[in-house]
């Protein structure tokens, strides 16, 4: 018997999904578009209860957090991209790393922006 948890996170700006950047130019473009603006971070989560290889129960949910970034200079963006940090992250930034200096406000769950809304996951499992 086991519980399977799957999750993925996206960044949304003006209705457009920003996934992981394809290259450094894409990362710079994403960060420039986020600079000085508020965007949303969504994490979709699926929970599956499996017994003897059969799914017994399942539920899905999502969490949304509003994130506002300060205005960034081209040099700040270039230096951050050169660090390699944004290349494997939706929206080309990781709030838990170097990009923290670019965040001016968060409305919602910080851990959702990191990639897993852990409090919500815990409470969903408790009700599962």
Regions found by a protein language model. Give the residues of each.
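Anionic-ligand binding patches
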Residues: 1-128
